[in-house]
Amino acid sequence: MSTLPSTDPPPLPASTSSQQPAVHIPPPSYLDPTTYPQTLYLDPERIFIELTYHPLSPSTYLAHTRSPAAGANVLFLGTTRDTFEDKPVARLAYTSYAPLALRTLSSIARDAVAKHGLCGVSIAHRLGDVAVGEESIAIAISAPHRGAAWRAGEEVLEECKRRVEIWKREEFVGEPPGQGEWRANRDTDPEGKSTS
């Protein structure tokens, strides 16, 4: 009578030590701050996208969108404020799945260019810790006329908050570092009221 082979996995080799050697597995590149900034520049649309762990540079983002055809340049800077729902904020900490976030940001920018006839769009977002008073997002819009620039700037911001794969942890004064509340950027409306 024949027997079927065992489906059990083979035994592991005996270890000569009670401690297994530590294996270092590096983080994926999108979680490694040394691989940043990560940028996209789409020409001829004049679209500049950046994810960075460094302070934002508003003049750089305006420079990428300026055009002789533009009669209006609008810059929005989203800044870490010192309180949230009456709790004192120590800092915000942002994380992202960068490969997808870059794709989503470029899609938002392309949609805005097509819809509003823009001359250029820059979107930059900070990752990592962002202290009170520092910018976490910069949006620069260049358009032939101010109405299109203002409308596009607000739409781009709201689409970023609604769609981009970036999450934030609000850390409050008096809490241990690394603690806090994780939130999606879309958890508040344009006036700061909670939507959840």
From Swiss-Prot:
- Which HAMAP family did the record assign? MOC2B
Assembly state and interactors? Answer: Heterotetramer; composed of 2 small (MOCS2A) and 2 large (MOCS2B) subunits.
Q: Which UniProt keywords apply?
A: Cytoplasm, Molybdenum cofactor biosynthesis, Transferase
Q: Which domain of life is it from?
A: Eukaryota
Q: In which pathway does it act?
A: Cofactor biosynthesis; molybdopterin biosynthesis
Record Pfam families: MoaE
Q: Which cellular component appears as one GO term in the record?
A: molybdopterin synthase complex
Q: Which reaction does it catalyse?
A: 2 [molybdopterin-synthase sulfur-carrier protein]-C-terminal-Gly-aminoethanethioate + cyclic pyranopterin phosphate + H2O = molybdopterin + 2 [molybdopterin-synthase sulfur-carrier protein]-C-terminal Gly-Gly + 2 H(+)
State the residue spans of region: Disordered: 1-29, 174-196
Q: Does the keyword Nucleotidyltransferase apply?
A: no
The reply to whether Cytoplasm figures as a keyword in the UniProt entry is yes
Q: Which residues bind substrate?
A: 145-146, 161, 168-170
Q: Which family does it belong to?
A: Belongs to the MoaE family. MOCS2B subfamily.
As one GO molecular function, the record gives:
molybdopterin synthase activity
UniProt biased composition (Basic and acidic residues): 183-196
| InterPro entries (UniProt xref) | MoaE_sf (IPR036563), MOCS2B_euk (IPR028888), Mopterin_biosynth_MoaE (IPR003448)
Q: Where in the cell is it found?
A: Cytoplasm
Q: What biological function has been recorded for the protein in this entry?
A: Catalytic subunit of the molybdopterin synthase complex, a complex that catalyzes the conversion of precursor Z into molybdopterin. Acts by mediating the incorporation of 2 sulfur atoms from thiocarboxylated MOCS2A into precursor Z to generate a dithiolene group.
Q: What is its EC number?
A: 2.8.1.12
| This protein's name | Molybdopterin synthase catalytic subunit
GO biological process, any = Mo-molybdopterin cofactor biosynthetic process
